[in-house]
């Protein structure tokens, strides 16, 4: 029987050398074993025991409604939106060191 040997020697990053790590792995074994999954073929419309049914929604209609809502609110075209002009930076006062409150 032959075994694979894995070794690793890398620095820690703090100036100290890490000790060599040697792991023996038998053929056919992996270091990370995953539990077997239940692969049952379930047809659409069928429910698994203990799980709530999935609610199917009409995607196209929902997306179209969301797009309309976005365009209405993003541009600010509504009658309740008032135009505001940003202040002119030339007339703004700049505080110098020591001015103002501590």
UniProtKB/Swiss-Prot annotation:
Primary location class: cytoplasm
**Ranges of compositional bias, category Basic and acidic residues:** 45-85
Name the UniProt key words of this record, in alphabetical order.
Activator, Cytoplasm, DNA-binding, Mitochondrion, Nucleus, Phosphoprotein, Transcription, Transcription regulation
A molecular function annotated in GO for this UniProt entry is: transcription coactivator activity
Phosphoserine: residues carrying this PTM: 7, 9, 73, 79
Sites where Phosphothreonine occurs are at 51, 71, 85, 94
Where is the segment annotated Disordered?
1-102
Modification after translation, per record = HIPK1-mediated phosphorylation at Thr-51 leads to the compaction of its intrinsically disordered conformation and is critical for its ability to potentiate the transcriptional activator activity of JUN inspite of a reduced interaction with JUN. CLK2-mediated phosphorylation at multiple Ser and Thr residues attenuates its ability to potentiate JUN transcriptional activator activity.
Expression sites (tissue/organ): Expressed at basal lvels in the adult normal prostate gland but is highly up-regulated in the fetal prostate and prostate cancer cells. Preferentially expressed in normal male and female reproductive tissues, testis, fallopian tube, uterus, and placenta, as well as in testicular cancer, uterine cancer, cervical cancer and kidney cancer.
State the Gene Ontology BP annotations. intracellular signal transduction; negative regulation of apoptotic process; negative regulation of reactive oxygen species biosynthetic process; regulation of stress-activated MAPK cascade; response to starvation
The function of this protein is: Intrinsically disordered protein that potentiates the transcriptional activator activity of JUN. Protects cells from stress-induced apoptosis by inhibiting reactive oxygen species (ROS) production and via regulation of the MAPK signaling pathway.
- Subunit description: Interacts with JUN.
Family to which this protein belongs: Belongs to the GAGE family.
Q: Which PANTHER family match?
A: P ANTIGEN FAMILY MEMBER 4, P ANTIGEN FAMILY MEMBER 5-RELATED
Name of protein: P antigen family member 4
Organism per entry: Homo sapiens (Human)
Lineage, uppermost ranks = Eukaryota, Metazoa, Chordata, Craniata, Vertebrata
């Amino acid at each position: 029987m032959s075994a694979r040997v894995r070794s690793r020697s890398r620095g820690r990053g703090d100036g100290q050398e890490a000790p060599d790590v040697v792991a023996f792995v038998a053929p056919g074994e992996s270091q990370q074993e995953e539990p077997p999954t239940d692969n049952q073929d379930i047809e659409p419309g069928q429910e698994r025991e203990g799980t709530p049914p999935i609610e199917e929604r009409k995607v196209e209609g929902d997306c179209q409604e969301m797009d309309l809502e976005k365009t209405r609110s993003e541009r600010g075209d509504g009658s309740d939106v008032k135009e505001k002009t940003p202040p002119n930076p030339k007339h703004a006062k700049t505080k110098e060191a020591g001015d103002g409150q501590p």
